[in-house]
Amino acid sequence: MKRFIAMLLMLCSALLMTAAFAEEAAPEAKITVVEQRFINMEDDGRGFFFAKVQNTGDAAGYVDYKGNIVASDAEGNIILTENYVSTAPDEVYLEPGEYAYVCENIYDDALDTAEVADCKFSIRAADDGEEYEKLASEAKIHYEPDEEDDNYVDVTFTNTTDEILYDYEIVAALYDQNGELLFINTEVVSGIGVHPGSTITVRLYIYEDILMYFCREGLTPTTVDALVYCEK
């Protein structure tokens, strides 16, 4: 009887270990911040936050809409926090290896007197979200720093779906010659239909204060990565 009980306990233990291992090994999405930039506009109470996030997990998933920014000064004092920071578009679905961009305008009086020296951004995967279809596109930069109103990115794409597209979002990320993320702009277009097979070009401008920041810091955008999303 004792031997039977001992064998039963060993069997139960083995089953529990197998279940625990299976649960631990279950594939899941993991959202990783691979690049980011915080721009503190001087004496303006404004800032810009840009990031590239990637699904580095082994399963597809959505990006949570509750990302968190924590910005600190040179002494490590927290200047500001921002919650509910999401991708563009919101709660996007990513397969393993796929990426999306984050573009957040920040308004906070603390930026009038304090300068951001360090910025930490965290965002998780979620079980629910939105699914979009991505359309192939081409993008070109027009950059003339001496001309304040003549700096932009043209993004061209073709409607390869079977329906007229009335709602779509364009995201353009600018990089320098070293592959450093400099700036992201987005454009949500609604109510202008693109017929199946038709091609359209959307212009996204580089803000004047971003241009001044580039000139002040000696930065030059040389390449652009554009993503075009439409609702499924």
Residue spans of the language-model regions?
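Short acidic/proline- and small/hydrophobic-mixed sequence motifs that coincide with surface turns
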Residues: A59-D64, G76-I79, I164-D167, L181-L182
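Short, solvent-exposed loop/turn segments enriched in Ser/Thr/Gly
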Residues: D44-A51, E147-D154
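Sec-dependent signal peptide cleavage junction
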Residues: L15-A29
